[in-house]
Amino acid sequence: MSDNDALRALTAQMAQEGIRRLLVLSGDVSWCRERALALREALAGDWLWVATDAPAAPHCTPQALQTLLGREFRHAVFDAQLGFDASAFAALSGTLRAGSWLVLLTPPYSAWESRPDADSLRWSDCPQPVATPHFIQHLKRVMARDEQTLHWQQSQPFSWPRFPARPHWQPATGEPQPEQAAILRHLLRMPPGVAAVTAARGRGKSALAGQLISRMSGTAIVTAPSKAATDVLAQFAGEKFRFLAPDALLAGTETADWLIVDEAAAIPAPLLHRLASRFSRILLTTTVQGYEGTGRGFLLKFCARFPHLRRFELRQPVRWAQGCPLEQWVGEALIFDDETFAHAPQGAIRFSAFTQALWHTGPAQPLAVYQLLSGAHYRTSPLDLRRMMDAPGQHFLGAFTAERVAGAAWLVEEGRLSAALSQAVWAGYRRPRGNLVAQSLAAHGGDPLAATLTGRRVSRIAVHPARQREGIGQQLIAEAYGGASRCDYLSVSFGYTAELWRFWQRCGFVLVRMGNHKEASSGCYTAMALLPISEAGARLAHREHQRLRRDAEILARWNGEAIPVIPLKASTLNDDDWDELAGFAFAHRPLLTSLGSLSRLLERCELALPALRGRLEEKCSDANLCIRLGLPGRKALLVAQRREVAHALTALDDERAQRLRERVLQWQFFH
């Protein structure tokens, strides 16, 4: 039997068995492409080629793959020669029909882990690509123990193997599968209340929701993060499908017998709670074990508020057979099996720091930490796995029992920018990669040199639900504080809730910033807080906290929510206000960043300043203000507002205004 005949026979067997497989081609670029093109000639199929520079159609870049979700393909090539976009790779695997090959192109096997990975530019906060040895070593370990994955290396012999036969697979007919049918029976008889259906990709979760709508006697409204993602649901719901976006649903008065929320974990929890209060029966569906994030954290946080919640899980794949080798390999390689929280960590707690090197010497421990963090945070994705394994400046702490992980914290080094760059960030001239809190302290705070200090930001922290309220989270922060003696502060950025803020207060943090718009991911205002370590860190925390207190009443009026600090009455302009106003008038600081000082300027100044007063005092929208003032758009409006502030400063103290103007203009010449 020729090689092509053996390939076709194996592919036919895979189709009968309802499975997909991974074939890894390792070698130089031209060899890998030649082999992949030869496979494309030998096997009929779609052969979607995912690469930045593909030699054949159909093709798309890894970044464009999200636009193809919901479609299906037979066979695909994923080019990882220059970089491995893990989310795109996982998404591609989910589009492949039963009987498909996913062909992965990699650099020569021995050189792979030392090669700079272009994808690292998205998550490493480095200006140049970095090598990713821990991730590549992890992939190699997964490949080595997986007998179902095929590996063809340049200059090495290869033949198509024969695999033992599996049971023949019966593809879905469109009727509910046994697992779906059982859940449908429960839902159709369900009294008023909330139900949640969780599933990994390809389990028919959206189909189940559509089947519920088509079979119910009453009416239903469907909502989801995007309508485009509800195509499958709409197909099964038929004529009874009715979609409203979450914000439109909340703004209106529409009602129905059921509210169906598809991918509920991707909708901000406060918004979801408000929606849930309007309907008597609610079905929430969300993905667990996925490249878009995991839903177990959603179940823990959101569903805990509904004590009589009915929970269902779909386990049986619909689009391929149980035990599909490709699904198993992707799940193991990208660690989609997050912590289920089914088993409580028992016994005494031992706190221990570890580094990324542990992925090489003892991978079980960092793997368990990642699974805990993934299970507790909805938005954990393969990008976070890549960062945890190989990004510079990462620090990890675990709270371990004898056999399990009870808690973990992940911190990221920030700051240490040059004085010139920090000043340029403050003035709005630069936003270099990374440094979330350190940059925000400069860009939105009052100290142009704030980003020169060294901080460690708490990126993630989680405690197993069975061990919460024992002080483990606080102890993790205390351990992090003790291990950061050479830093100026610890920092955290989070979606503000009173409950979360109480935790950070107990840890000793000082609130230094509240955002002025709600984050889409949490439905909350962003809060930032510091735990000072050095004297310089203490001075910065005090200065920014006092600034927040001066702005508190103004921010509260703007946000419509109280700021959790003791307000300071301040109607006069101090030195910090003058600096900030100069940064707005003569440089590029944003309008809302300067809300407090601008509001105090309007109180002090008797000039008309229509562009500024219209926005800040009347809360007129940019569009309406442009019409009123005869301006062509938002850019022209911002120019007018900056000009008005410059005019007001000059009127108050011309000499001081010019001196500050000359200073902030110098800051654009950073190095």
From Swiss-Prot:
One of its GO terms (molecular function) is 18S rRNA cytidine N-acetyltransferase activity. It is found in: Cytoplasm. ATP binds at residues 180, 202-211, 319. It catalyses: cytidine(34) in elongator tRNA(Met) + acetyl-CoA + ATP + H2O = N(4)-acetylcytidine(34) in elongator tRNA(Met) + ADP + phosphate + CoA + H(+). Residues 349-531 form the N-acetyltransferase domain. SUPFAM superfamilies: Acyl-CoA N-acyltransferases (Nat) (SSF55729), P-loop containing nucleoside triphosphate hydrolases (SSF52540). It comes from the Bacteria. It is an enzyme of class 2 (transferase). Its EC number is 2.3.1.193. Keywords: Acyltransferase, ATP-binding, Cytoplasm, Nucleotide-binding, RNA-binding, Transferase, tRNA processing, tRNA-binding. Belongs to the RNA cytidine acetyltransferase family. TmcA subfamily. Catalyzes the formation of N(4)-acetylcytidine (ac(4)C) at the wobble position of tRNA(Met), by using acetyl-CoA as an acetyl donor and ATP (or GTP). This is tRNA(Met) cytidine acetyltransferase TmcA. It comes from Citrobacter koseri (strain ATCC BAA-895 / CDC 4225-83 / SGSC4696). The gene is tmcA.
